[in-house]
Each structure stands twice: as C-alpha cells, then as structure tokens.
Amino acid sequence: MATINQLVRQPRKRIVEKSDVPALQNCPQRRGVCTRVYTTTPKKPNSALRKVCRVRLTNGFEVSSYIGGEGHNLQEHSVVLIRGGRVKDLPGVRYHTVRGSLDTSGVKGRNQGRSKYGTKRPK
C-alpha cells in the first residue's frame, strides 16, 4: 500500500484501454478504396482460400479486410465500407467489408442471415 506522501508525489496511473480496431478511430464504419484483392490461407488447423482485400481508408490508414459470404464483385479501385471484427484464423485481418453497401454487392441466393450479407428479401 502506498503512503499518502508517495501518492502526492506520484499519483496512481489510469489504465488505458487499447482499441482492437485503431483504424476506425472510434467510428462504427469507415469508407475506403481497394488497393488489392486476393485470397490467403488460414492458420494451422484450418484449410481454405479466404477472400481478403487491402483497403486504403479515407483517414489514410491501409488495412486488410475480410470479404464474407460466397462470391464477391470487388476489384482494385472498388469503394467499400469497412467495419470492425477480426477473423480468428487470418493473422493481421482485423476488419470486415460490409456487404450490400457502396460498390460491394450482397450475396446472391442467401435466405438466412440476410441482413449480415446485404441481401434483399426474396419475393
């Protein structure tokens, strides 16, 4: 336990919480332009070709973003919306692209969990 004199000389430090998504700068989403669209393989126990794009955000950050869902229409210079949320088996991928907004199309033929993939309600 610190004495009162010690606390007067050097007060207690506040613990600063580190952000999981620093590039968003406390915003819910950010807009950006794709600089590279590619596939990459996940960490050890899993096996797949995960779709990822490198995005230059409007605030100057350059981040990797995961493209969820089956099939996508993104290419270089596509304008995308980025939200937070990491992909556990892809190191360095801490953001998701928002499907169905800006240049990103929704997932075709999706009937369940449609709101997460930007799919309109089937007639």
Curated annotation (Swiss-Prot):
One term under GO cellular component: small ribosomal subunit
Modified residues (3-methylthioaspartic acid): 89
InterPro entries registered for this protein in UniProt: NA-bd_OB-fold, Ribosomal_uS12, Ribosomal_uS12_bac
Segments for region (Disordered): 100-123
A Pfam family of this chain: Ribosom_S12_S23
Keyword rRNA-binding on entry: yes
Example GO molecular function: rRNA binding
Record keywords, A-Z: Methylation, Ribonucleoprotein, Ribosomal protein, RNA-binding, rRNA-binding, tRNA-binding
One GO biological process term: translation
UniProt key word Calcium: no
Gene3D superfamilies, A to Z: Nucleic acid-binding proteins
TM regions (residue ranges): none
Basic residues bias spans: 111-123
Biological role stated in the UniProt entry: With S4 and S5 plays an important role in translational accuracy.
Self-association and partners: Part of the 30S ribosomal subunit. Contacts proteins S8 and S17. May interact with IF1 in the 30S initiation complex.
Family assignment from sequence similarity: Belongs to the universal ribosomal protein uS12 family.
UniProt name for this protein: Small ribosomal subunit protein uS12
Phylogenetic classification of the source organism: Bacteria, Pseudomonadati, Pseudomonadota, Gammaproteobacteria, Pseudomonadales
Gene that encodes it: rpsL
